[in-house]
Amino acid sequence: MKEMRPKPEDTAPEISRRQFLRTSALAAGGAVMGACGESPTGPSDPTARVSAVTGTDLHVMVGEVLAQLGGIQSVVNQGETVFIKPNMVSLPWAEHGNSFTGGECTKPEIVAAVAEECLRAGAAEVTVGDGSHALELPWEHATTLDGSTNLLAEMARLSQEYGRPARVASLEVDSPEWVEVPTGTSLGTILVSSLLTTADRVISIPVAKTHSWAQLTLSLKNFIGVAPLWRYGDLPNGIPDRGVVFDHSSPRAIAAIYLDMVRGIQPDLAIVDFSIGIEGNGPNLSHGGRTVDMRDRLGSYLLLASTDLVAADTTAARIMSHDPGKVVQLQMGYEMGLGEMRKDHIELIGPRLSDLRVPWASAHIGGQALMAQVVCPRQAGRGHPLHG
């Protein structure tokens, strides 16, 4: 077992040109998450585009949802390196549980399909990575829903087929170094893996879940897992947990951290996995969350994609029957200029929002539901599944 401690070079102040440009822009803009009382600056692009696709074949759906945005080639150029960040929060225990069929983790078939799209577009290298709650992740247990293969095997296949590196990375042990990103919180800076800061393109692929500390965990919150456990974690009950240093006292407090990370990293694309997710007191079943299979509520799986992460997450919130105006991270992200949340400024490509919205139980924080549920037309004529 490798020790959870930094090597001397892990905290080296050197940063890539890409990260320098990004953090310089952050500093120049006076990026301070805590200053949420400021007037909203709004996004630079007045209209965001969110692609939505329904179906039952996740591999096929990936191509379709990207095609509606102009294809992956509109994001990834030939010769560029790509980092893909799925949500693999319970992968360390996937061998003994239902991390994927239970809705806790991003589905491996989606991740592999996105990686292949990038390679097909000419990407020089694709890395899939996460930190989760372990030093080394058992990627061989990231099994597809049909059980036919796993993410480790699929990345090896893609590497051989395209003749370019396609790999998985456990950030705690595979990060060459850790790069400081400015934050307006008391931390001053936040370390993130250099695998993201040196990549030409960064793609967030979360699974749709409610969260007992963050309200929702989608493409923005997904980046909490790229910070090192050795700096921000501890071992309560033997499980590394970033909540030891990162302030989880309220949705606003934790959002102040991961939104500054997003602003420093500047992701290029979000793809939201709406196949099987979590409602109620997520992000895990062990916390009191409940599995949501979209085939039961929508009649099919659903994928969202957008180059605007705030717009993607805002649309996801609406589909989950949550009021985006009461989801703290979305309001904060909009005020920071990270993206669009105004409904009339988001173009939904594909099915109508009213045809996608499903009942989805909110998380409870301190015994109170923080998000007002909107009326969902799918509740008419049947028992309310939010309480079933």
Spans of features found by a protein language model:
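Extended, low-polarity segments enriched in aliphatic/aromatic residues
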Residues: D45-A112, E116-G388
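Extended, hydrophobic interaction surfaces within ordered domains
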Residues: F20-R22, L338
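Generic signature of intrinsically disordered, low-complexity segments enriched in small/polar residues
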Residues: T23, G34-A35, V181, V226
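N-terminal secretory signal peptides
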Residues: M1-I15
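Sec-dependent signal peptide hydrophobic core
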Residues: S24-A28
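N-terminal twin-arginine translocation
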Residues: A12-Q19, G30-S44
